[in-house]
A protein has these predicted regions:
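Conserved P-loop NTP-binding catalytic core
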Residues: 37-39, 43-53, 57, 66-127
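Electropositive, glycine-dotted interaction segments
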Residues: 117-269
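Short alpha-helical segments and helix-capping/turn motifs at coil-helix boundaries
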Residues: 4-7, 103-105, 113-115, 234-236
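Well-ordered beta-strand positions enriched in small/hydrophobic/aromatic, beta-favoring residues
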Residues: 21, 105-107, 130, 144
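Short catalytic/ligand-binding loop motif for oxyanion handling, primarily in non-cytosolic enzymes
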Residues: 17, 63, 74, 128-129, ...
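Pre-Walker A-like glycine/lysine-rich segment at the N-terminus of P-loop NTPase domains
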Residues: 3-71
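Short acidic, glycine-rich loop/turn motifs
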Residues: 9, 107-111, 134
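Short, intrinsically disordered, charge-balanced linker/junction segments flanking boundaries
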Residues: 1, 268-271
Length: 271
């Protein structure tokens, strides 16, 4: 059973400072709305929302923070064959200091009865650090720590006793790990079968998916009041909009005839 609890980005696209999206339910829940709109599930004594809305003005960074999921899958699941291959790196562009610092993503997630924190720091040249911790009630247990020393150009990974990686597995991963590959992508490359590490790899490869909706035509897809089916769908959409405090009570689809200025039409003809 896989659930995401939080996602944090630092120096990533438009996010200069550490910014977190929480997927947890607050105490002041509305039970009726919860029942209507999926609500939450309790995992490891934490109430995790099944559905989250991101609201904000154009340019507020909604799509950029969601692109962190895409970045995670790219860094973790894709294999670089050469250590000089560049990585996708999008730091905060309006501060010169940020251009010389790594980006960072942290994700807290649940796999069955366990809760984990994974963090990764990188720039276009290398992955500088990876940490995987198991989060328990009173303490955090480190499972592995990987780091890259830029001065010596050496990559190291330390698997703790808690993760029970054999000496042979440790040797294969350590000797195969390039500065621009993650521990998990190296596991893919070396085809290592380790139950716990493979379960995390499966989470990052299949636990979430970015769906591109840019080609959806709202004029065609948005339901109106013409049929009973579309009325019901419209009521659901309006209920969603109301539940997230948009102050939108209803909407209408109107056909608008566009009139182009004569001067513009004349210029287009002369091109």
């Amino acid at each position: 059973y896989l659930m995401i609890e939080s996602l944090t980005v630092t120096n990533f696209y438009c996010f200069k400072e550490r910014t977190t999206i929480l997927f947890t339910a607050k105490k002041e829940r509305n039970r009726m709305l919860d029942n209507n709109f999926c609500g939450f599930t309790t995992q490891n004594k934490i109430n995790i929302l099944k559905l989250v809305f991101l609201l904000g003005n154009n340019g507020a960074g909604k799509s950029k923070i969601l692109s962190a999921f895409d970045a995670l899958q790219y860094l973790i699941a894709q294999i670089r064959e050469r250590k000089d291959e560049s990585l996708r790196y999008r730091p905060f562009a309006f501060d010169e200091e940020c251009l010389n610092k790594p980006s960072e993503i942290e994700i807290v997630y649940h796999i069955n009865d366990s809760r984990y924190l994974y963090s990764i720091k990188w720039d276009k040249y290398a992955i500088y650090e990876e940490i995987l911790d198991e989060l328990r009630t009173k303490t955090n247990i480190n499972l592995f720590h990987r780091w890259y020393d830029k001065v010596s150009d050496i990559v190291k990974v330390d698997f703790t006793d808690k993760i029970q990686v054999s000496d042979n597995e440790n040797y294969i991963i350590s000797s195969s790990l390039l500065k621009n590959n993650s521990v998990f992508s190296t596991i893919i490359k070396t085809n290592i079968s380790h139950a716990l590490l493979n379960s995390h790899l499966l989470f990052f490869m299949e636990g979430f998916e970015i769906v591109n909706l840019e080609d959806v035509d709202l004029n065609e897809e948005l339901p109106d009041d013409k049929t009973e089916n579309s009325k019901q769908l419209k009521n659901v959409i309006c209920s969603f909009l109301k539940s997230v405090d948009t102050n939108i009570m209803s909407y209408e689809k109107l056909k608008i005839d566009v009139e182009y200025p004569a001067e513009l039409l004349q210029k287009l003809k002369s091109l």
